[in-house]
Structure formats: structure tokens, C-alpha cells
Amino acid sequence: VMENNAVRGVVIESKAGRQAILAKVVVDASGDGDVFAAAGAEHEQRLHAVGLVHRLGDVDRADLAKLQAAGFQNLGGAEPLPSVHWVNLRGPSTDGLDIAELSRLEVEHRRSIWKRVEQLRTTAGGETLFLLQTAPQIGVRITRLLAGTRKMTEAEARSGNQYPDTIAIGGTYDGGRGKPGFAIPYGAMVPRKLDQLIAAGRCLDVDSPMVEDMRLIATCLLTGHAAGAAAALAVKDRCRPRDVDIPKLQALLRRQGAYLG
């Protein structure tokens, strides 16, 4: 729902039918930038590997060395119990906005997992293994990236750069092995031209090398916290999200337990 250049709400479909939900500030936490794209904000689209994760049970009774010798290299890792392994099977780079392709891959990946488990169970060392759980839906890693008022770059992130509008310190994709945490600027969450909308999650304005780090769940949570706080301040101070008082926002986040460096 638009009024001139400002987002005033969203239209949804539910069991109650079609409804409009209006707000003074809208936070797009869809992960795919669904709201800012529909509103006409500048953005780019990326392709990335999709996948379907699953868990294997009775792993502690299996002979993993025999299974790996037989060619099953990806047997996941123990999580949360020694008897349970979490396995991540990556698929091809895919348009995560193509619902027909996602539906096809959903079926393909589930069949592939069942087939793989059957093969494991008929291989020496894997007789006791069973499929404990599959993810509720196929995992999409990245789709749209917002064009914000500030772009995050890997060069800045790896240098330990602090932005004037830092709203969080994110973690790294490799678990910190050789890569430090990095500051996230508020400007990466705010559209260049669109008003009354803030983006949160993996769809912020970052360069290609930063995509893997920004899509981590913990980092997405941090940006969601900042987006909610900024939206509340914008409403309270009767200003546009791009005009939020940054020191006031940072002070609010710190009072709520956020670490900003």
C-alpha cells in the first residue's frame, strides 16, 4: 500500500480473505525483500545454491569409517546428540523466487534423501541408520538485495571498520576461523528512495563476498532487533526511518543488550 513515495502497509491473503494491514513504518523481514520489491525499491537479484537439510538417527551405532570408505563422505555432524547427525545437502544455484522451480526441487531433494538413506542402510556399517527428520521446506540462501543508503563491503568488514551508524556486530560464516566480526550500518537497511520502510535479514545492501555472512541466522536476528527499534523511534519522533537520530538509536539498542563494538 503506497502513498506517494511512502509505504503505508501491506495487503495479505489469509483464511479471513484479503486484508490490508497499515502501519506508520513497515519492516520487511521476509528475507526475500518481498515488500520493498513490491513497493518499487531499487534492488538486485542473486542466484545461490538451495538445499534441504535432514537428520540421521542411530549414528552412534553406525560404522562411519566403513560408510565413508564406501563413498558416503557427507554424513553431517553430531547435533544435538551424538546419536543424531545433521546433514546439509546442497543443490544447484537456483532462482529462489521461481516457485515452480522450487516446487520441483522440493520433490527432487526429498526423493534424493530417501534414496540416500536406503543406500546407507544397505551398506556395511549403516544398517541401523534411519531418517529422523527433514526440514519443513527447501532452504533458499539468498534472492534479492536492497539498494540502501549505504553499501556494506567486505574490505570494510575485514578491516574492522566502524560506521557512524553501526547498529550491530555480525558474525562470520566460517565460525570465526581467520575472519573477525564486522559492523553493520543502519544505512544498509534503509532504501535509497523509498520512505517508511526498513529492511531486516539477509536482503540488506552488501557486496557479493558479504552475502554468506549476512545470511546467518544470528546476524539476521541482530538486524531484526535494530529494524524494530528504529521503526519504533521513527514513529515516536514522527520522522522518516532515514532521518532517525542515530545516537539515540544506538543508545536504545545498547540499553536492550545489543553489542555495537
Feature map (PLM): residue ranges:
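Flavin (FAD/FMN)-binding glycine-rich loop and adjacent Rossmann-like elements that form
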Residues: V1-N4, G9, E13-S14, R18-V25, ...
